[in-house]
């Protein structure tokens, strides 16, 4: 009798896991058809049910969905149309987090190559967020973006050892550190002015400004 009950329990559990995995596959199809809201509903259920077996796939698809959303905003900019900078930033951060979670579950490294390529490209977009937010005087958001760019190798394991990430040829790390210090000061988040101070002081063009920011921060705290 106990063996029979156990068999039924295992059957029910496996059926539930299979159903949740089907939700993820269905969500993939919906994303391809640009039915984003419907896809998100299915993914939310799959990610929170506790029954989904292939969590790496679920988080990979979730990352793809967020990528679709922030890419839509970039396409607007390319077409010289107004873009929602807050929506762009929100979905970029969410996409990065989703791919990182995928990597944590991806024991067989099925998605590593794909997501590594994405992460290599997406770092630049953090600079867009920083620029958008600074121009809109959202200094907290600007600091977050610059800090995320600077700490990218530490926070994204798939690209942590990539030479192009460790030594970015597009943006000067010391210049980005200066932007971070400036955003923190403008946002009156004085403790964060010192976070990237050492690197910012190496940006010779604005080293004097950085020292002044540091001094004013000490006086205003």
Regions found by a protein language model. Give the residues of each.
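Bacterial Sec-dependent N-terminal signal peptides
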Residues: 1-29
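Short coil turns that delineate tetratricopeptide repeat
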Residues: 51-53, 107, 154, 205
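TPR repeat positional signature
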Residues: 23, 59, 66, 126, ...
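Start-of-domain marker
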Residues: 20-78, 83-87
């Amino acid at each position: 009798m106990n063996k029979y009950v156990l068999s039924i329990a295992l059957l029910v559990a496996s059926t539930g896991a299979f159903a949740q995995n089907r939700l993820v596959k269905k969500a993939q199809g919906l994303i391809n058809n640009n039915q984003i809201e419907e896809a998100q509903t299915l993914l939310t259920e799959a990610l929170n049910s506790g029954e989904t077996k292939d969590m790496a796939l679920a988080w990979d698809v979730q990352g793809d969905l967020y990528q679709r959303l922030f890419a839509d905003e970039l396409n607007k900019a390319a077409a010289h149309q107004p873009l929602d900078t807050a929506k762009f930033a929100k979905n970029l951060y969410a996409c990065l987090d989703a791919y990182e979670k995928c990597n944590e579950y991806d024991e067989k490294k099925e998605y590593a190559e794909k997501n590594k390529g994405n992460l290599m490209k997406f770092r630049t977009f953090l600079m867009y967020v920083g620029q958008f937010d600074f121009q809109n005087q959202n200094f907290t958001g600007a600091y977050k973006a610059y800090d995320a760019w600077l700490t990218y190798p530490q926070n994204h394991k798939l690209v942590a050892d990539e030479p192009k990430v460790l030594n970015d040829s597009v943006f000067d790390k010391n210049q980005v550190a200066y932007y971070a210090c400036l955003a923190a000061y403008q946002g009156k988040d004085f403790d964060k002015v010192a976070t990237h101070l050492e690197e910012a002081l190496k940006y010779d063009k604005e080293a004097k400004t950085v020292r002044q920011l540091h001094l004013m921060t000490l006086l205003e705290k």
